[in-house]
Curated annotation (Swiss-Prot):
EC number: 2.7.7.59, 3.1.4.-
Keywords: Hydrolase, Magnesium, Multifunctional enzyme, Nucleotidyltransferase, Repeat, Transferase
NCBIfam families associated with the record: UTase_glnD
Catalytic activity: [protein-PII]-L-tyrosine + UTP = [protein-PII]-uridylyl-L-tyrosine + diphosphate; [protein-PII]-uridylyl-L-tyrosine + H2O = [protein-PII]-L-tyrosine + UMP + H(+)
HD domain residues: 465-581
Protein name: Bifunctional uridylyltransferase/uridylyl-removing enzyme
Record flagged with keyword Nucleotidyltransferase: yes
Organism of origin: Psychrobacter sp. (strain PRwf-1)
Activity regulation as described: Uridylyltransferase (UTase) activity is inhibited by glutamine, while glutamine activates uridylyl-removing (UR) activity.
InterPro entries referenced in this protein's UniProt entry, alphabetically: ACT-like_dom_sf, ACT_dom, HD/PDEase_dom, HD_domain, NT_sf, PII_UdlTrfase/GS_AdlTrfase, Polymerase_NTP_transf_dom, UTase/UR
Length: 899
């Protein structure tokens, strides 16, 4: 039977299969017809034809083809029945969707009928259908239906042609094999597993529009569990059953239509059954969907607007799916359980009850009669450790949230309840997540509306702004959890001592509140934060602190990652901006949480150690610690004394204090300013224990190269110390060797001793994790470096292709120079696209231009590399403006990816 008559649409009808030439005897001209169908659908899609019509029309066209071929192979003269199953059974086919069919027989096929079936199947392949086919008896179905995937396919079986008496068999098999609760439990387990494979979030950078949370599968799941009980054929049938409201149905259909349009464009764009919205496709799909990019817009405005609508759509589907599947359980499964198996019910107050681990309104009119109960409910959840809300209450909440207006926001009781919610830390992330999903947060804080689904088209910002803010608040909770104590020991101890945690929670909410408005979001957010806090009765001091945290929430991370925090002047300047220890403690906690909630893959122990170092150094200054050094010479003396104390505890016959001090006198002041005592200790041991290196005056000595695990880093992070005669191409050849061995540089400290020996320290990320465990890998790296140092010719660079993901981003190369009077060096700040061999290519340019590198700070933020180099000419002289401009031009030319 047809879903609809394809001739009534814009789709070309199936030609007469009996009127074909000899040359077409196998494919009957059908491949050309299938191509025409896809062209018709593409044209109709461009014209804005209702996507639902196109989905159903393609299924109807395939229906007509299969029916005619079934007849052509004389299968209508048998007891067989032909069913469409799966998505095709629902009557939903995108251009390259799977065409799954079931040929059902009452009994085992005879040889003659089996031969006809084989011919039918072969014909389908010949014409280009590539179907998924199952040929089964009723008994076969009963056996395989114990598999939930097979059972789901059978549940959606739709008879196309054949033995009409078999039409109800697939559905009956499912009913017979699976109880209502078993089927529900299996589908929920399946959904949880699917979501887990996609990071359990709707906000993946490259979402699978079918299987990710909030994808088409979540809508299908609603249909599957309800079809098992109600035996419906379409979702709208749930409305008369009072399971689904008209508005909920409309919301689901709108969201489904949006995803179908994306899926159709994806299939047309890729020419295959592609459901992953990769970066490669997002710009093209945005354009095809009508998202325009004007010259006045930001470079990524169109694609960001498109993805914002996708994320909002996914959140809507996910919210409805969670609510409706829970509603199914509560009303159709739990309600039928014996009293002893139902969740225990208790009274919280006159307005709310506790039902197991859920909260529920006491009667239908709670929110209408007591508007403050909207916020009271969330406070009760925190106070009583309740994580979930009953679905009847959620539906009432969704309606009530629409009534939150300016009058509601101005009510002093409501303001108090909102702040009380932020003070109550128990389940705060979960409570705010529900507030967001059901409209409470956006209606109470109108600024939040624009943040929902707002994304930044890059690899650094892993989540949408609204998701990021809530994840930041979840990170704050983790700082107090024993489970994460080892990961966040220092920040956790600080956060636990902060009594008024709502200060940081409010800073978390407001730190990105102004994104997407244009202008400096930190400054705009500061004004919003102060206004909100004062309007909610908070003190001026609290409001200013929250405003300050909002404005300067990036200060600490940028200082730690992009400046040389071994320079006392850098730390002192930062300390002056921070002002006091209270500001520092709050900023440190907020910054660590912010970085983790931005992109957990970019948070590593190296960044953690930078943050810790900046915090501890700044805290000493702000506390006016009498034992803390106050100038360069005092810092040098303190560092040397601490390192010497460590060395005195080392039992090593190759070292004595006189040897150590003699060596140190040759290393220069800069070394003791930039290295920590522990590093100086192991460097000194390495140098004095490896003759004939001994002293910098030994001109013929072999280079010393020592590797070890970084004490504050994960196992795949490696420290490498290089002590050798300085030479013009040292940085360039070192970077080239690291690149050849696929080692990423996290940090570089490049120091020249007073007698022209280099003391270079690098922190490397070993992608393969073999440097510390495999002696051959260590020997190979050491050998390559020594060979490169001995052969001063231009290092050979390895040509590498730009990774797929990076091809979709445009990061213009920008270079700024500042002269540092104290060090008499130029500080070169470079921003460019992170790309294979980046540092090696920069090093080669430095070599060719006669540039000496004294220090480097390497920072990678998603697809962006933001690096700093302290440079001079080979003679340590100031570079001329002309040379700086030539260096800038050359680097931009070298680092701009070719098309």
């Amino acid at each position: 039977m047809f879903i609809s008559d394809p001739t009534d649409s814009l789709i070309t009808p199936l030609p007469d299969l009996t009127a074909h030439s000899e040359a077409q005897s196998r494919n009957l001209g059908i491949p050309d017809w299938l191509k025409q169908i896809e062209a018709d659908i593409a044209t109709a899609l461009e014209k804005g034809v209702d996507i639902r019509h196109l989905v159903e029309a393609r299924a109807a066209s395939i229906d007509s083809l299969l029916i005619e071929l079934f007849k052509l192979h004389e299968l209508t003269q048998t007891d067989l029945a032909l069913f469409a199953v799966g998505g095709y059974g629902r009557g939903e086919l995108s251009p390259y969707s799977d065409v799954d069919i079931l040929i059902l027989s009452p009994d085992t096929l005879s040889a003659e009928i089996s031969q006809k079936v084989d011919g039918f199947v072969a014909r389908l392949w010949d014409v280009g259908i590539e179907p998924g086919i199952a040929v089964r008896t009723i008994e076969d179905c009963l056996q395989v239906a114990t598999d939930i995937t097979v059972a789901t396919n059978l549940l959606e079986a739709r008879l196309l042609i054949g033995n009409d008496s078999l039409s109800a068999i697939p559905n009956n098999v499912v009913q017979q094999t699976w109880s209502q609760k078993e089927f529900y439990d299996a589908k929920m387990a399946e959904a949880r597993a699917r979501h887990l494979l996609h990071n359990g979030t709707e906000y993946n950078l490259e979402p699978d529009i079918k299987k990710s949370p909030g994808g088409l599968r979540d809508i299908h799941t609603i249909g599957w569990i309800t079809k098992r009980y109600f035996r419906i054929t379409k979702l709208y049938d749930l409305v008369p059953q009072d399971f689904l409201t008209e508005k909920e149905f409309d919301e689901l259909m709108f969201a489904e239509g949006f995803l179908w349009r994306i899926r159709h464009h994806l299939h047309h764009l890729t020419g295959r059954n592609e459901n992953k919205l990769l970066f490669d496709y997002q710009r093209d799909i945005a354009e095809r969907m009508g998202y325009e990019q004007s010259e006045e817009d930001e470079p990524n405005a169109a694609v960001e607007n498109f993805m914002r609508d996708y994320y909002r759509c996914a959140m809507q589907i996910s919210t409805l799916s969670e609510m409706l599947t829970s509603h199914y359980y509560e009303t159709l499964i739990e309600a039928r359980l014996p009293e002893s198996e139902r969740p225990e019910k208790s009274v919280l107050n006159a307005r709310f009850n506790r039902v197991g681990d859920h909260i529920a309104i006491a009667h239908h009119h709670v929110f209408a009669q007591h508007p403050e109960a909207i916020l009271e409910m969330f406070l009760l959840m925190g106070q009583h450790g309740i994580k979930h809300i009953r679905t009847r209450t959620l539906r009432a909440l969704k309606i009530a949230a629409r009534g939150i207006d300016q009058h509601y926001r101005d009510n002093p009781l409501h303001k108090k309840l909102f702040l009380d919610n932020l003070k109550e830390q128990n389940y705060l992330f979960h409570r705010l997540r529900i507030m967001k999903r059901y409209g409470v947060l956006a209606n109470y804080m109108p600024q939040f509306v624009n943040l929902i689904g707002l994304m930044q088209y890059d690899l650094f910002h892993r989540y949408t702004v609204d998701a990021h803010i809530l994840l930041l608040i979840r990170m704050l909770h983790r700082f107090t959890s024993p489970k994460y104590q080892d990961d966040f020991a220092l920040v956790g101890s600080i956060y636990k001592r902060i009594e008024r945690k709502e200060i940081i929670v409010l800073a978390a909410i407001f730190h990105d509140i102004a994104k997407g408005r244009g202008g400096d979001h930190s400054e705009l957010g500061e004004r919003d934060a102060i206004e909100f806090c004062l309007s909610h009765g908070m003190s001026e001091a609290d409001a200013k602190l929250i405003g300050w945290l909002t404005r300067y929430h990036l200060l600490m991370s940028m200082t730690a990652q992009k400046q040389d925090i071994s320079d006392p002047e850098v730390v002192t300047k930062f300390a002056n901006l921070v002002g006091n220890v209270t500001h520092l403690n709050h900023l440190y906690v907020l910054t660590v949480a912010d970085m983790n909630a931005t992109n957990p893959q970019l948070w590593n122990s190296w960044r953690a150690s930078l943050m810790k170092q900046l915090y501890t150094q700044t805290r000493r200054i702000l506390r006016a610690d009498l034992d803390a050094p106050t100038n360069r010479q005092e810092m040098i003396a303190t560092t040397r004394q601490q390192a010497l104390t460590m060395l005195d505890k080392v039992d090593n016959q190759h070292m004595n204090r006189e040897e150590v001090l003699a060596l140190w006198d040759e290393l220069g002041d800069e070394y003791f300013l930039r290295e920590i005592p522990e590093a100086i200790m192991w460097h000194t041991e390495a140098i004095l224990n490896h003759p004939p290196i001994g002293r910098a005056s030994d001109a013929n000595s072999e280079p010393l190269i020592v590797l070890r695990e970084h004490r504050e880093l994960a196992l795949d992070a490696v420290q490498i110390f290089i002590y050798t005669q300085d030479q013009a191409n040292l940085f360039a050849v070192t970077m080239a060797v690291f690149d050849q061995m696929n080692l990423d540089v996290l940090d570089a400290r490049i120091i020249t001793a007073t007698r022209d020996f280099a003391l270079d320290s690098y922190v490397l990320l070993d992608r393969h994790g073999t440097l510390l465990t495999d002696p051959e890998s260590r020997e190979e790296l050491t050998r390559r470096l020594i060979d490169a140092f001995k052969n001063p010719e231009t290092p050979k660079l390895v040509q590498k292709r730009l990774p797929r993901r990076l091809k979709n981003f445009q990061v213009p190369t920008t270079i700024d120079f500042n002269y540092n009077e104290a060090s008499r060096q130029h500080v070169m700040s470079l921003t460019t696209l992170d790309q294979p061999g980046l540092l090696a290519r920069i090093g080669q340019v430095f070599l060719n231009e006669g540039i000496e590198v004294h220090a480097a700070r390497i920072t990678t933020l998603g697809e962006r590399a933001e690096d700093m180099f302290y440079i001079s000419d080979i003679g340590d002289n100031m570079l001329s403006d002309a040379k700086l401009e030539r260096l800038r031009t050359t680097l931009i030319d070298v680092l701009t990816p070719s098309c």
